[in-house]
Amino acid sequence: MKRPDYRTLQALDAVIRERGFERAAQKLCITQSAVSQRIKQLENMFGQPLLVRTVPPRPTEQGQKLLALLRQVELLEEEWLGDEQTGSTPLLLSLAVNADSLATWLLPALAPVLADSPIRLNLQVEDETRTQERLRRGEVVGAVSIQHQALPSCLVDKLGALDYLFVASKPFAERYFPNGVTRSSLLKAPAVAFDHLDDMHQAFLQQNFDLPPGSVPCHIVNSSEAFVQLARQGTACCMIPHLQIEKELESGELINLTPGLLQRRMLYWHRFAPESRMMRKVTDALLEYGHKVLRQD
């Protein structure tokens, strides 16, 4: 069985994390040539490329598997060393999360762990339909995803659902929907998407109003908080988690344009198995808080 040397594997990890050989060399305090030699050594060991030499470099399928292995080893080292780690450099935990969870429930859920444990978070924001891929590629050790099925050598638990409402300000509704929300009025009302792959708004309109994708004018804004601001100032109508706008709905600053209609996204927590002690703390915190504030039915 081929057993990689973890010093060389850390060179591969650094190239991916630092998005290039030069910065990886600086991170590892070695020469760029030494980084290249270590990766070539790994590739010779496995008889295949581990990096696609693009800008930035990205791991091949085998490279992804090795990076996932490295993540597990790092967490298990923390478990085995236990109290010997006390006072040392905080453990880095890379997690893939969707922007709406980050804007609503995730940080309060992690607050007790962050206050009690020597860890540093590296939160990688990705759409909930794609976060699991980051776990598959070994870029993170845990992911909040809508996928319910666990990857090989991983664990999964249900967190609960975010309910999305179709909302806008009252002046916006009076301007674009004077006779209510209809198929024809929606064609003129500007909306918002997180990125070009975000299909939340389109899926809602297609399901409830039979509008094909791409038929509605749409701003692209990579910020959950900006969705709320755009809706409040009367710039656009948006799909926003109910959890994020409870105060605005109660005050009347925002109104639900389609009462009785919503888009529900069930969320799941994925991570490598076996879990280290630190990851178990993270899991317990996420599940406990998620079960309190997210829909469970």
Swiss-Prot record:
Matching CDD domains: PBP2_IciA_ArgP
Disulfide topology: none
InterPro entries reported for this sequence: ArgP, ArgP_gammaproteobact, LTTR, LysR_subst-bd, Tscrpt_reg_HTH_LysR, WH-like_DNA-bd_sf, WH_DNA-bd_sf
Keyword tags: DNA-binding, Transcription, Transcription regulation
Keyword Chaperone belongs to the record: no
Pfam families assigned to the protein according to its UniProt record, in alphabetical order: HTH_1, LysR_substrate
GO MF, one example: DNA-binding transcription factor activity
Origin: domain of life: Bacteria
UniProt domain HTH lysR-type: residue ranges: 4-60
Subunit structure: Homodimer.
Similarity section: Belongs to the LysR transcriptional regulatory family.
Functional description taken from the UniProt entry: Controls the transcription of genes involved in arginine and lysine metabolism.
Protein name per the record: HTH-type transcriptional regulator ArgP
Gene name for this UniProt entry: argP
